[in-house]
Regions:
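Conserved alpha-helix/loop element of class I SAM-dependent methyltransferases that forms part
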Residues: 10-27
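Conserved class I S-adenosyl-L-methionine
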Residues: 28-37
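Class I SAM-dependent methyltransferase SAM/SAH-binding core
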Residues: 38-75
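C-terminal alpha-helical "lid/dimerization" subdomain adjacent to the S-adenosyl-L-methionine
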Residues: 41, 118-179
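A conserved beta-strand element that flanks and buttresses the S-adenosyl-L-methionine
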Residues: 87
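A short His-aromatic
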Residues: 93-95
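A short glycine-rich, Lys/Arg-flanked "PGG" loop and its adjoining helix->strand segment in the class I
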Residues: 101-115
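Core SAM-dependent methyltransferase catalytic element
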Residues: 176-195
Length: 195
């Protein structure tokens, strides 16, 4: 699959995110990209051999070659244990706090083995300010007035463990890992379903 990016910045960001999840995706694994956005990260994984399905609450895809299903933000329209890996890349902070746990439960339900999550993880007041600005901007982009919430790394880990997920990997990412004008504190998490 040849991927045509609309900008070098998006190409860089997408390849970076795909590079973070790729070590946890075996060749020919089935992957669900929840909150897929433009679909570029999923396309990068598909180009590496993964079988990828995209889903989101709105259709913002630029990648049309991969299968896609809309979902209502609460219930993923897939069978139990359908995917090897379910990834939520910079998605959960856009989900209202009271719906974060149920969405994690849904992601775990449709996964056979693991979840991979990339999240903004504020560490100070400047991070919280920048995150709030980002959240408001994105809400305007998709025409939503729903609440959103950013958690620290410790808060995310507490939530994951509270859902019965095993945190196998938690890594702080560099502030400028995506772009110089997005100096957000971010983290990557690999979660496994209990045996």
């Amino acid at each position: 699959m040849e991927i045509h990016y609309h900008s070098r910045v998006v190409r860089r960001e997408s390849r970076h995110a795909a590079g973070l999840v790729a070590p946890f995706v075996e060749p020919s694994a089935s992957v669900l990209d929840v909150g897929c956005g433009d679909g570029y990260v999923a396309a990068e994984l598909a180009a590496r051999g993964a079988s990828v399905m995209l889903t989101d609450i709105v259709d913002l895809r630029r990648i049309r070659e991969l299968p896609f299903r809309l979902f209502d933000g609460r219930h993923l329209p897939f069978e139990d244990r359908q995917f090897d890996v379910v990834m939520l890349n910079f998605v959960l902070h856009h989900v209202p706090n009271e719906l974060k746990a149920p969405l994690l439960d849904e992601a775990a339900r449709v996964s056979r083995r693991r979840l991979f999550i990339l999240e903004d993880t504020p560490r100070n007041a400047l991070d919280r300010f920048l995150n709030r600005r980002h959240g408001c901007h994105f809400r305007a982009k998709i025409g939503s007035s729903a609440a959103f919430g950013f958690f620290t790394t410790a808060e995310w880990e507490w939530l994951f463990r509270g859902r019965g997920l095993v945190v196998k990997y938690a890594r702080a990412l560099g502030r400028f890992c995506r772009a110089p004008w997005q100096p957000f504190a971010r983290s990557a998490f690999l979660l496994e379903l209990p045996a």
